[in-house]
Amino acid sequence: TRTSLALLVASVWRFLVLMVGKAPSRAVDEWRSGLQLWRSRSVTREMTQRLQDFHAQCDPDDLENTNRLLPSRRSVWARAVDRYAGDLSDRIHPWRNEDGTTIDDLTGDDFTVRDHRSVVNPYTVMVSLMVVIGIVACRGLYGSGRATSTWLAPAPCGLAGAWHRWLTAVPGLSGGNAPWLAWPAFGSVLTIGEPEVLVRILFVVTPLLTAMSAHRLFRRVVGLGTTTVLLASFWGMLPVLTGGLARGSVTALALGVILPHMALHTWRLVNPETVDVVELRGAGTGSHQVGGVSSAGGLALWSALAISLVPALWVYPVAVAVGILMTRPRRLLLGSLVVLGPLLVISPWIPRLITEPGRMATGAEPVLSPAVETRAGLWLLVGRAIVPGTAPTAFTVIAMAPLWIAALWAVWRLVIDRSASIGSLTGHPRGRVLALIIVYLVCLVLTGVASRTLVTVWNVQVHPAIEPWQLVGAGVLLILVAAARQSAMLQRAEADHFPADESPTLGQLLVGIGNRWLPWVLTISVTASGVWWLVGGARGPMSTTAATRPAYVTAVEDSARHTRTLMVNVHRGSAHWNLVDSNNPSWGSGERPTISSDSRIADLAADLARAVATGAVPDDLADRLSDLGIGHLWLRGAGADVVSQVGNASGLTVANTDPTTTVWTVDGHPSRALLSSRGSSQVPVTGKVTESGTVTILEPRDHRWRVEVGGTRLSPAVRHGIGESYQVGSARGDLTWSMPTQRWAGAIELVALLILLVVAGPQAAQR
């Protein structure tokens, strides 16, 4: 019975693997064989008994010698590891055992001349250099404090804080949180619960990850070689060159990794009949044909990750699905998978997008830094649409000009030159090349429009997403260059069969010159970008800063009173303010209203901030601050007269932290929870509730609040002012309140992502 059960479990396991590998016929065979073995377990038991009887009659020495001939478990694992290491070595060094010498070379008069290939792998060189440069370039991030930038909020404290930002509901807002917040939550697990360590590591390795992602695409198009590595390296430098790294832009850094995978699966879908150039170059060891369903699943998977950052990028899978249905009308399943798969992943987030449609056009953390300086016009051609963090003009011109030269050569090669090979990446004569050119022009227009217009997101004016269209536009140029390079390689292979006395045409000469100089042109772009990365690509707005609020302020925020701090910064005649607490700002703070989702709290806080910035404070300033649960007032950059006028208000205790910053403590121990008993006014709750009455939490209105006293959940009461009220009744003990954890949203996102991951997986061989 034990043997039959083991065979049944093995059959079920193979059944699941084959179903994941999209081979249902073989999976059914495995299932049937497993059931047949289990039903005939009496036969198995009889055969086992006969085998035991036979062994009992044999000489023990003979049995031992026979067992030595059988492979041990250690040898099986050793063979598997050796086979994997051999395949990996063949992929890294595909020409290690080849010297390009044929039998004709050996039998000719000049057989001593051999065409040796170098064993130096350009890909290994790229990885090594980018690791070293990344470590040196991020030298300013090593030390204490938290890394912050234009679009990078401070990391939360600990693993629980990272998961809290993803799964905890936001009061006053419907739907789940932005799905991209799951990435740092899971990433913090890998860094042993240290989100700040995750941030530092990602700043060092993100350009490398971006280049590796692009290398997978370009090696599919061009094959292995120096040109492929240069194209991938330049793509990896784009977030550095355009300032995405220095700004801490999650959108730019993540899309740098995501977009090449989307392009790769699109290429497989649109050109299913094309041959992988890597196989032609001899590096196709262990490769297999990727099915249409796997490619559609891969595109849906990576598109889901992209639209969790920029929902407007959903137009990409929609456009691909339309193209699929136009060329292959019967592939409705593929089109539906590409379009609906990403929506399934972000479905918990859709209700929030519907209530705030402006978020669909922006990138991650849109309201974190709304007042960002942008440019339009010719600056768009060199990637300077967003000013903060972007490389200086000299570096961008030196880096982008060679790319433009290579792109113009590619357009001439693929569109104008009549001798261009048709069977390249485009798959059809010039039509899809023109489509790529149109895509680039559209991206250029969208970048210009986004840099000049504003959209409203949670009552804040912000620019639409600019970085995605910058990256897509630059990626189109690189794909055109890769396609032209592939076309030139194919024509060069065809030219080897021409008669020796035939003179090359002008087009063939220009192709040869361009093909010969293309690596050097790309080297200039990569070198300029790398120098800027090394000098200042990870600096600018990026810095590591200690807590801007004194320790005694943060201690009160973390206490049972859970107070807020009103921070006002006066700079060049304009005032900026924020209402912070122990959890904000942090990851995801730019995905929700800046001050509060309750307009009454936000308006009152804004009125107080403007009054503090100008010095025209009311006499009851301390009472108004206390009514909002504000325990401290932080002011920086104001003149001495403004500081004096604010300090004259009663109920405030002043403390100067530095020459430009002043902090006032609100007297009376304010709290975000108030208790009102019969016949008495509201008093702040400092931790425990010891009498009956009504508890009011100064939070945005939301029926999902869970308020407990000593573990007993309180029932809601009528409240006409700010906050939510609850009846204490007979409950006594510590007062706690929290929003629910949206496990359902996380489960939907993870299950949908897992389904797409299975669909995108490799396909098992069919019968």
Segments (PLM) and residue ranges:
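Extracytoplasmic/lumenal acceptor-recognition loop(s) of multi-pass membrane glycoenzymes
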Residues: 557-628, 713
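Membrane-embedded helix bundles of polyisoprenyl
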Residues: 207-220, 224-327, 334-350, 525, ...
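Active-site-proximal, structured, solvent-exposed surfaces of multi-pass membrane proteins
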Residues: 670-767
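Signature aromatic-anchored transmembrane alpha helix within multi-pass, membrane-resident enzymes
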Residues: 488-532
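Start-transfer (signal-anchor) and selected internal transmembrane alpha helices
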Residues: 101-139, 758-767
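Periplasmic/ER-lumenal interhelical loops and adjacent helix-loop junctions
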Residues: 110, 165, 338-424, 547
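Active-site-adjacent helix/loop segment of glycosyltransferases
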Residues: 1-39
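Membrane-interface coil-to-helix junctions
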Residues: 135-210
